[in-house]
Amino acid sequence: MPSYRSRISTHGRNMAGARSLWRATGMKESDFGKPIIAIANSFTQFVPGHVHLKDLGQLVAQQIVASGGIAKEFNTIAIDDGIAMGHDGMLYSLPSREIIADSVEYMINAHCADALVCISNCDKITPGMLMASLRLNIPTIFVSGGPMEAGKIKWKDQDLTVDLVDAMVAAAAENNSEEEVAEMERAACPTCGSCSGMFTANSMNCLTEALGLSLPGNGSMLATHADRQMLFEEAGRQIVTLVKRYYEKGDETVLPRSIASRKAFENAMTVDISMGGSTNTVLHLLAAAQEGEVDFTMTEIDRLSRRVPVLCKVAPAVANVHMEDVHRAGGIMGLLGELDAVGLIDTSAYTVHAKTMKEALCRWDVKRTNEPKTHEFYRAAPGGISTQTAFSQSRRYDSLDLDREKGIIRDKEHAYSQDGGLAVLYGNLAKDGCIVKTAGVDQSILTFKGPARIFESQDSAVSAILNDTIQSGDIVLIRYEGPRGGPGMQEMLYPTSYLKSKGLGKVCALITDGRFSGGTSGLSIGHVSPEAAEGGAIALVEEGDIIEIDIPNRTIHMLVEDDELMHRRVKMEAKGKAAWQPTEKRKRKVSKALKAYAAMTTSAAKGAVRNI
């Protein structure tokens, strides 16, 4: 039987000093011996997805205490990728994932906590906490802040639901007036919560649900809705139940590595592919798998992408569909139900709320149950009022969206496509693979051939697009933006948004060893591995080289003879210290912290985790 970790610091004569300090935090004599459960909060006033989290840790804590535990809350950092984007701030985004994972590990192990509740929400925070939970392997439950409501606007005589990306595209389009742009900007992000489309934050929160590490509704219930309070309260109660099952009954099935097993990772990736989630999820799931010592690689993702259909499309893949619509259709449990109906989910996987995923689906899939409370839960609707306050409204739809033919979630027979929403491409340009979000690619450009336009920074590519030097048929290639080369693997939302605003979204492609925001759509191929800075072939592409992309056959090639590529490689190596670096020095301040990250990071094909 495992011993409570906390007793290292709460029991024994030699821990008198530690107990004195525990008492100074408010612990009483009767508290020593109770499980100490850490609450990792990520509240910050910098990020709309986290601005409402300040008091939610104590909401969880109250339930932990009422259930017989001791709750101790701490905070970690959170970066807003949207605010950090378009300047050197984005260099810090991906590296912050490792800082978050480390900070959670440090706090848990330094204070010998018995269990963990992770209050996350946005892009790197959920992945960082997920990595930490798999390192630590103590009972853990995730509960996120939830998605924001979509913006509602009557714009140019059209009634639209909009988000951050719509504001960016509107601003870049020269035919829109200043007032029209300002109107869109004011409407795009009306409430607290993670951006309303299937961007990275919402994708990852949906995937913790698919992994079995969070409660039903975690990925889709709006941040503003009163029902989300139930998730926080239940997380507090349920973590104590998991603690007792592990420490008092020796039940290892409640541990993160038992729940997030290989079959759970396959379930999560299957969900991701079926809903056209952010390509960043590939990066983060690969990283989490490494932390949990799960054999889950790009090979498995490639295999799954060939057999999983697209059952759900959400902004930015389609207009006017947001997370609130997914929730009305049954959320992630509804999507899991449709995938299970055609044998694509392993329902023997464990969860934090039911013994198996099969049991969970019987209760929470709206197509399988007539339980009134479940149906009421998924009828939670947006309030339509601008607010930064959690649980501030309780509006409900009159009915659920149970249409599996033309509704938000479809069955396999009526899928958007029988091929998955994410694809792994291989070829002489990406020996170790690269990723494309096929759910966001127009059918007319699933195969594409064009000349490479070479840029060695995101900034130079943006300038070229805005100055109209990119033409229909071009392939914008941005290199030296990978984990090591950036460093930090910047997101390329601005180049893709500007291509879209220039009317080039369906007639151009973009290839990079950097990554893309979950808000990206179009023929945008990222995570090219190996990256330019580690000797990848992307560094050898020259202006005008023809590149051929074939998504149906999962290939990406530059049409250059092998002998010529070898000649270019020898020529590059002859540069010595200047090899595998941008031709011209970039105006970019790389701090010691970023240099340390670059020195230890691995390629995107390995999740950009550190190699130590």
From Swiss-Prot:
InterPro entries: Dihydro-acid_dehy_C, DihydroxyA_deHydtase, DiOHA_6PGluconate_deHydtase_CS, ILV_EDD_C, ILV_EDD_N, IlvD/EDD_N. Pathway: Amino-acid biosynthesis; L-isoleucine biosynthesis; L-isoleucine from 2-oxobutanoate: step 3/4; Amino-acid biosynthesis; L-valine biosynthesis; L-valine from pyruvate: step 3/4. [2Fe-2S] cluster binds at residues 122, 195. The active site is at residue 517. It is an enzyme of class 4 (lyase). The modification N6-carboxylysine is found at residue 124. Binds 1 [2Fe-2S] cluster per subunit. This cluster acts as a Lewis acid cofactor. SUPFAM superfamilies: IlvD/EDD N-terminal domain-like, LeuD/IlvD-like. Transmembrane segments: none annotated. Belongs to the IlvD/Edd family. This is Dihydroxy-acid dehydratase.
